[in-house]
Amino acid sequence: MPPKKKKVTGLIKLQINAGAANPAPPVGPALGQHGVNIMEFCKAYNAATESQRGMVVPVEITVYEDRSFTFVTKTPPAAKLILKAAGVDKGSGEPHKTKVAKLTAAQVREIATTKLPDLNANDLDAASKIIAGTARSMGITVEG
């Protein structure tokens, strides 16, 4: 007989700085209420995201009824990648009136390539359009 599947008791989604997870809020309270060993998660997450230090990396944590967990790291948010590529700290307060930066089509394609596994797109062109739309809504002009 095949082993029984563990019963899932919770799904937690967090956005944490890569390699910098610690038991302080927001990580501690979110995991604590599900009974997860917080330090164990922090060590595993920091080890998994060490190469991406300085970026915000979303993580999906699946908690099982025996209080064990698994987690999947995602690609950094598109907005963060766009801001980094454009070299600005934040988007425009009035995106359709005030433009804060410009991105080239090549930069948009590069970001789309990075984000492709997490986007709802079948090919690179569709992913590029999604990224370009996000950039426009932040007051960043896309050229090309």
From Swiss-Prot:
It comes from the Bacteria. It holds the Pfam family Ribosomal_L11_N. GO terms for biological process: response to antibiotic; translation. Keywords: Antibiotic resistance, Methylation, Ribonucleoprotein, Ribosomal protein, RNA-binding, rRNA-binding. One of its GO terms (cellular component) is cytosolic large ribosomal subunit. InterPro entries: Ribosomal_uL11 (IPR000911), Ribosomal_uL11_bac-typ (IPR006519), Ribosomal_uL11_C (IPR020783), Ribosomal_uL11_C_sf (IPR036769), Ribosomal_uL11_CS (IPR020785), Ribosomal_uL11_N (IPR020784), Ribosomal_uL11_N_sf (IPR036796). GO terms for molecular function: large ribosomal subunit rRNA binding; structural constituent of ribosome. One or more lysine residues are methylated. Belongs to the universal ribosomal protein uL11 family. Part of the ribosomal stalk of the 50S ribosomal subunit. Interacts with L10 and the large rRNA to form the base of the stalk. L10 forms an elongated spine to which L12 dimers bind in a sequential fashion forming a multimeric L10(L12)X complex. NCBIfam families: L11_bact. Forms part of the ribosomal stalk which helps the ribosome interact with GTP-bound translation factors. This is Large ribosomal subunit protein uL11. It comes from Streptomyces griseus.
